[in-house]
């Protein structure tokens, strides 16, 4: 099936009452793991990477093109519908480069801005992306971040959400409704009433960030209230590190190191980390209801 528009993937999810995960990758192995899981589960995929927890000098030197190019090539070869997302870019210039390198969906990290500034910046992104055939996600409201003692949250106001979407023509709206960035363990309390109120007045699919902290029992009720996409990342990195550490500990003394680094075989310690991510993402696709929808 290959490259697909994110807005089409999310429209189908919203209509069907399920969520599609954006599983945030950071390199070749994690990108491949996400696509392998999608093909195994026959789930639509949103492949991509983010700028929020990635070194900015590296991204600005060549990282945007490197990761966007990898994700695009995988999407083109996919047997399921696959979009390519640059998530939470720090600048409009990064978005410009991401679009040129193959991303067909973008999001500017603008939720910290005052409403008027966020509105103006989002309009600039839409003016870049839509003529290039790319979709735009924006976040309105502000999530807490578990890395910084929670911080302050600003829940999304339904009336503001409606006006913002109408004024910007974005394709997806990330909302603050109880989820928390970088929280593990499914302890977030999702405000389902707020989701219902927003979905009733907003024409585009809703998105929840902070997926690692969303309890499993809240996922399908959120999907029934307009949420079509969940962003997920924290536990993927933990799974990768656990698989890598376990594999590295088992490398025999005096072994041919080529068998364990870069071989792309089952012995390769990086492939072992990739397998852990694939297993985790596959299970989440089942939980989100997207398995079997491609």
Provide a role label for each language-model segment:
Residues 20-24, 84-85, 107, 206-209, ...:
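Short catalytic-loop micro-motif centered on adjacent basic/acidic residues
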Residues 22-34, 183, 256-269:
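Short N-terminal signal/transit or membrane-insertion segments
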Residues 4-16, 28-55, 62-79, 89-204, ...:
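Alpha/beta enzyme core
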Residues 218-294:
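C-terminal alpha-helical cap/extension of soluble enzyme domains
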Residues 1, 18-26, 58-59, 268, ...:
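A short N-terminal beta->alpha junction/helix N-cap motif
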């Amino acid at each position: 099936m290959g490259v697909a528009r994110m807005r089409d993937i999310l429209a189908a999810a919203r209509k069907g009452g399920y969520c599609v995960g954006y599983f945030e990758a950071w390199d070749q192995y994690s990108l491949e793991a996400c696509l392998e899981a999608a093909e195994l589960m026959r789930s639509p995929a949103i492949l991509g990477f983010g700028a929020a927890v990635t070194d900015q000098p590296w991204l600005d030197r060549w990282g945007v093109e490197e990761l966007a190019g990898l994700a695009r090539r995988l999407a083109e070869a996919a047997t399921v519908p696959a979009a390519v997302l640059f998530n939470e870019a720090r600048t409009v210039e990064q978005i410009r480069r991401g679009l040129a390198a193959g991303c067909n969906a973008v999001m500017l990290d603008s939720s910290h801005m005052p409403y008027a500034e966020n509105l103006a910046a989002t309009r600039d992104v839409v003016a870049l992306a839509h003529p290039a055939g790319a979709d735009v996600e924006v976040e309105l409201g502000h999530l807490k971040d578990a890395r910084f003692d929670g911080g302050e949250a600003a829940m999304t106001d339904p009336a503001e959400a409606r006006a913002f979407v109408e004024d910007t023509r974005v394709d997806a709206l990330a909302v603050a409704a109880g989820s928390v960035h970088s929280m593990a363990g499914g302890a977030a309390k999702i405000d389902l009433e707020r989701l219902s109120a927003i979905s009733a007045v907003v024409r585009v699919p809703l998105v929840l960030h902070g997926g690692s902290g969303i309890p499993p029992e809240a996922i399908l009720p959120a999907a029934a209230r307009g949420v079509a996409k969940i962003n997920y990342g924290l536990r993927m990195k933990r799974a990768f590190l656990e698989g890598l550490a376990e594999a590295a500990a088992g490398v025999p003394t005096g072994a041919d190191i080529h068998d364990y680094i870069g071989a792309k075989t089952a012995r390769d310690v990086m492939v072992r980390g990739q397998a852990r991510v694939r297993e985790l993402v596959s299970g989440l696709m089942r939980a989100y209801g997207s398995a079997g929808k491609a």
